[in-house]
Structure formats: structure tokens, C-alpha cells
Amino acid sequence: MESIEDKALETYSKNIEYFSKNHKELMKLLTTLDIAINTGDYEPRYDLEYIDGYFDIKDIKTGAYVYNGNSLNISKDISRLVDFKKNKRTFEGFPIYTFSDEQVEKAGGITKLVAGVLPMTRYYFEHSDQKGTMKEINKFIFVGVRLGLHIPIIHEKIKSAEYLIIEDDLEIFKLSLFTTQYYTLAQDATLYFSVADDENLFLKTTRLYLRDTFYENRYLKYVLFPTYPTNKLKQIQNSIMTQSFI
């Protein structure tokens, strides 16, 4: 029987192969981190530990754990937060124009762009349930990866075609390569990664995610990892509001 350690190393190796071929810039960051650790220029802050049947991330200096409990059960709890409701954990990816004829007249007319979509958006607004449920979730955002154990569980639940995966800590993301099979997920969906990005790079990545298949951006569902900083939600909203066609 394959040991836990062997399975983790195999997962890591296949992930590295996947990133080397498909996400070269992220692979450069991971390689740079490895070199810095091996040369002693960077002292690792975190360690991956296997405790009573589950993995956790240990802060080497403080001894604190990121999950501080059964990470498998916690990941299942996170997956239960995800639903198909339009008004829960959702970004609205583009506006719905609902101007009345009177409002248009008072404004002195509308631009050609808005004029072209106004009849369609009016129809959509009048004939759709803005607080109902979605039949499918085609694009989804993971805000905070940690070990990524919740990612495949949520994918099994929603089967999205595109995922934006966000993690600010490169060292923690590297640990997730031992526990989460990104290479398997990539067989079912298109993956966008924002890892250790500054604000400019984050904006660039999110704009790419929003631009491709922009017609699927009406409702963008997301899940925020517990204890993960909420400032990324505001940055995502800023990216949405600065799309070129809004």
C-alpha cells in the first residue's frame, strides 16, 4: 500500500510537472523560493505535518496551526458554504441597465453601446429572479488556498469550467502542492492562479480571468477561506468595476 508520504510526494511531483508546462511564471516563483531555502537566504516559516489522519500547516516560530483541527472536516465545512444562490457570496460581474424611457429622455439620450444592450438587459431584468438560484456555476473564485483540500470537494459539487485561485503566501501555496491535485482539476476546468501577487499583478490576473468568457460574469460565486484576510474581496470588486466595457 502506498504510504501517505509517498502519495504526497507523487502529488507534488505531478503538480510541479503541470505548473512547469502551463503556468511558467508561477513556476519561476516556486523555483526561486526553493533556491532561496536551499542557499539559506530564506528561512522557512511553515512546515507540513500529518496528524491523526489529516494534514495541517504549522507555524515553525509560534507552534500555531493554520487549521488547528481536522483539516478534512474543516474543508467539508467550507464546501457547505457554497450554494447556487445569486445573492450569497456573489460578485455581480457586469451591470444590468434598467433605465426607464423617462430617465433616458431626462439624461439626454444614451450612448450607442448602452443603446445596443438596453432592450436585452431590460428583458433580462423583468423576466429573471434576481434573488433566485443559478442552474449552474460556470466561473468560481477561491479566495485563500491554504492546503487547498476544499478545492476538489467544491469542484465535485459545482463542476465549474473556470476557477480563479488566490493565495497571497507563496510558501503556504507550495505546501498545497503536496495535498491538492491541481493537475487533475485542470483536466476538467481552466485554472487561473494569483499567488503572491502585488496589487498590479493581481489586477492583471483578475482582468484576464474576467475578460475570457466575459459573458459568464453575470454572477461570480466565491468562497473565502476562514481566517483569510478579507481585503482581497475589495480588490476583486475593484477589478470588476474597472473592466473596459463597464
Task: Give each language-model segment a name.
Residues 1-246:
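N-terminal donor/sugar-recognition subdomains of glycan-related enzymes
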